[in-house]
Amino acid sequence: MPEYDYIRDGNAIYERSFAIIRAEADLSRFSEEEADLAVRMVHACGSVEATRQFVFSPDFVSSARAALKAGAPILCDAEMVAHGVTRARLPAGNEVICTLRDPRTPALAAEIGNTRSAAALKLWSERLAGSVVAIGNAPTALFFLLEMLRDGAPKPAAILGMPVGFVGAAESKDALAENSYGVPFAIVRGRLGGSAMTAAALNSLARPGL
């Protein structure tokens, strides 16, 4: 029978993974805090080249971490993002909210003529001020968030704009970078992104260090 040579210790795998990322990824343009965040995101997507597409506004990390420490809710566009958040890492027992499956969402989608992912954000209105918004799946959700902010909606403390896909993903993130309405943000330019990267970023923000 064949014998396979591989590392069996979970902690050793974890530590070696991060060491490889730090050795191979170009982190030179990031601050120390941003580099820690970037390493987590690379770990989630498996591509060291992805750092070229990471953009963090100057005050993003500090704003997001301060909000989380103050107990801000985390508003997620997708259940996969919400489920990826490690609750034990949250500094203030922060509520993690996803309204995509709320029974009111389908009717709201029909009313506004948009996707359920976008319509679900209308149910965030009372929780939006000072929150940490995490969009890792639907470009329509990010576009709609920008429309809400344009129209005077309360501002979150930080936005993680990381939807993935071939239709609207790159454009929605470019729109956020062009005008975030004064809200600190993080994006992954282009088609790359997704729930795993977004949740990894949240977990890094929730508890600094690797």
UniProtKB/Swiss-Prot annotation:
NCBIfam families per UniProt: PRK08285.1
Catalyzed chemical reaction(s): precorrin-8X + 3 H(+) = hydrogenobyrinate
One annotated GO biological process: cobalamin biosynthetic process
Record-given protein name: Precorrin-8X methylmutase
UniProt organism field: Sinorhizobium sp
UniProt keyword Amino-acid biosynthesis, yes or no: no
Lineage of source species: Bacteria, Pseudomonadati, Pseudomonadota, Alphaproteobacteria, Hyphomicrobiales
Subunit structure, interactors included: Homodimer.
Gene3D superfamilies per the UniProt record, alphabetical: Cobalamin biosynthesis CobH/CbiC, precorrin-8X methylmutase
Role according to the record: Catalyzes the conversion of precorrin-8X to hydrogenobyrinate.
Residues given in the record as substrate binding sites: 17, 40
Pathway(s) the chain acts in: Cofactor biosynthesis; adenosylcobalamin biosynthesis; cob(II)yrinate a,c-diamide from precorrin-2 (aerobic route): step 8/10
